[in-house]
Amino acid sequence: AQVESVCPGVVSC
């Protein structure tokens, strides 16, 4: 899973 400036939501930040 790729993490950008804002988390997509599906991944736990």
Curated annotation (Swiss-Prot):
Q: What is its main location?
A: secreted
Reactions catalysed, semicolon-separated, are: 2 a phenolic donor + H2O2 = 2 a phenolic radical donor + 2 H2O
**Keyword NAD: yes or no?**
no
**UniProt remark on cofactor binding:** Binds 1 heme b (iron(II)-protoporphyrin IX) group per subunit.
One GO BP annotation of this record: hydrogen peroxide catabolic process
Provide the cofactor list for this protein: heme b; Ca(2+)
Q: What is its EC number?
A: 1.11.1.7
UniProt-recorded Gene Ontology molecular function terms: lactoperoxidase activity; metal ion binding
What GO cellular component term, any one, is given?
A: extracellular region
* Superkingdom to which the source organism belongs: Eukaryota
Q: Where in the cell is it found?
A: Secreted; Secreted, Cell wall
What keywords are assigned to this protein? Calcium, Cell wall, Heme, Hydrogen peroxide, Iron, Metal-binding, Oxidoreductase, Peroxidase, Secreted
What's this chain's function? Answer: Removal of H(2)O(2), oxidation of toxic reductants, biosynthesis and degradation of lignin, suberization, auxin catabolism, response to environmental stresses such as wounding, pathogen attack and oxidative stress. These functions might be dependent on each isozyme/isoform in each plant tissue.
Tell me which family the UniProt entry assigns to this protein: Belongs to the peroxidase family. Classical plant (class III) peroxidase subfamily.
Could you identify this protein by its name? Answer: Peroxidase 6
